[in-house]
């Protein structure tokens, strides 16, 4: 969802930095990028270990960051290029569309409301309360089950390395649409296809993959 449907990764990074400033640390771009696709608490576990911060502060920091992101999405959240076009195309071809995300339910509701995508998904699965989030495949498997689809018949769209690994671990096809800052990295080899934008998705691509 984040970075694929809505341009919210910069908002997450801003929120995380604002929250962690109170703890006296700064998250650089590389450290932040290494955790894209993970649940917030797992990002915090990684960051707190890196900086030597007491993990007892994770739950409160998790809540603070999520609250900040929800406010930022309400204020300035916008759809990524090609989202509506891609969803229209998939609906025309008879695909059932699911949303499998690491984001919490509170943010999912805000994003769908803000972007007028409510009602466009046949299934929604959040890793919020799962034992493991991405790169574990469970959230994708749960979404496939809700769609009444076998995993190998599903096509996933991802913008993160952790999400791509989750999709492939679920034995699904995966189209990656990395951010411009990550597109040059040599980590996308497991994907079935790489696109610059959802604007580039075509009927031929979907039928061929």
Q: Where are these predicted regions, by residue range?
A:
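An amphipathic alpha-helix signature
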Residues: 13, 17, 37-45, 62, ...
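Asp-based, Mg2+/Mn2+-dependent phosphohydrolase catalytic module
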Residues: 88-91, 104-209
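Conserved phosphate-coupling serine/threonine residues in phosphotransfer and NTP-handling enzymes
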Residues: 4, 101-103
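Metal-dependent phosphoesterase signature
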Residues: 46-85, 93-95
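Helix N-cap/coil-helix junction residues
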Residues: 25-27, 53, 117, 149
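Helix-loop "lid/cap" segments that line or gate small-molecule binding pockets
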Residues: 19-20, 39-54, 111, 144
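Active-site neighborhood of HAD-like aspartate-dependent phosphohydrolases
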Residues: 1-34
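Short phosphate-binding/catalytic loops that engage adenosine nucleotides
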Residues: 25, 94-95, 172
């Amino acid at each position: 969802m984040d970075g694929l449907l809505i341009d919210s990764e910069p908002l997450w990074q801003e929120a995380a930095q604002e929250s962690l400033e109170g703890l006296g640390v700064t998250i650089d771009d590389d450290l932040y990028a290494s955790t894209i696709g993970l649940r917030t608490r797992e990002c915090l576990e990684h960051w707190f270990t890196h900086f030597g911060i007491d993990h007892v502060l994770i739950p409160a920091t998790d809540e603070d960051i999520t609250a900040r992101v929800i406010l930022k999405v309400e204020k300035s959240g916008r759809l990524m290029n090609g989202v509506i076009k891609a969803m229209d195309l998939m609906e025309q071809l008879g695909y059932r569309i699911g949303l499998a995300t690491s984001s919490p339910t509170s943010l999912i509701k805000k994003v769908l409301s803000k972007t007028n995508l409510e009602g466009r998904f046949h299934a929604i699965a959040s890793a919020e309360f799962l034992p493991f989030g991405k790169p574990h495949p469970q959230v994708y498997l749960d979404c496939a089950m809700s769609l009444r689809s076998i995993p190998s018949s599903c096509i996933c769209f991802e913008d993160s390395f952790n999400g791509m690994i989750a999709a492939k671990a679920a034995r699904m096809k995966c189209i990656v649409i990395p951010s411009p800052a990550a597109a040059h990295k040599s980590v996308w080899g497991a994907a079935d296809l790489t696109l610059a934008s959802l604007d580039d998705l075509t009927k031929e691509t979907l039928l061929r993959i």
